């Protein structure tokens, strides 16, 4: 049998039942975004994100990005993050992330259809990393594209918009 088609995405047959609320995320995504923050010039970035599974009740998550110029040419590597996403009772989502910048975070939120809202629950910064005190993330599937936004409070700033992107499913 193999795979079951569901709406605009395919559900792998061996996806753990707990992960069905996240089935629309499974796979690879690629696109572009923009970023800004106080004392940081605005920038554009290219991004690749993947959500994979091995039959257990969590998704493996990997994201990497590159700063790009106005011609979409890569200037340099930027942020990378890895983590695990798991759905608990009542579509509560728990996410653990680690960043190449020396930050690790725990996030808690809700999956509601093709929309995810997360709030940072706990954070850790290595001695040389910036201090992030709060964050919120939004993920949503709109007309087949994955839209993301990340609001951050860091280095004494209040919670405010930092990153947003639009990604297309690959393959």
Ranges and model annotations:
Residues 68-108:
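Helix-adjacent hinge/juxtasegments
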């Amino acid at each position: 049998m193999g795979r079951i088609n569901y709406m605009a995405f395919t559900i792998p047959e061996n996806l753990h039942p707990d992960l069905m609320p996240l089935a629309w995320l499974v796979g690879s995504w690629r696109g572009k975004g923009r970023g800004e923050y106080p004392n940081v010039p605005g920038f554009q970035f290219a991004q690749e994100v993947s959500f994979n599974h091995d039959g257990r009740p969590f998704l493996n998550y990997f994201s990497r990005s590159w700063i790009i110029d106005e011609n979409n040419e890569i200037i340099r590597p930027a942020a990378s993050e890895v983590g695990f996403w798991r759905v608990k009772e009542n579509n509560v989502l728990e996410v653990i992330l680690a960043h190449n910048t020396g930050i690790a975070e725990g996030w808690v939120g809700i999956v509601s259809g093709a929309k995810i809202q997360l709030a940072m629950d706990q954070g850790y910064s290595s001695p040389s990393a910036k201090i992030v005190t709060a964050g919120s993330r939004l993920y949503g599937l709109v007309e087949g594209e994955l839209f993301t936004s990340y609001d951050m409070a860091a280095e004494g700033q209040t919670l405010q918009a930092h990153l947003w992107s639009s990604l297309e499913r690959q393959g």
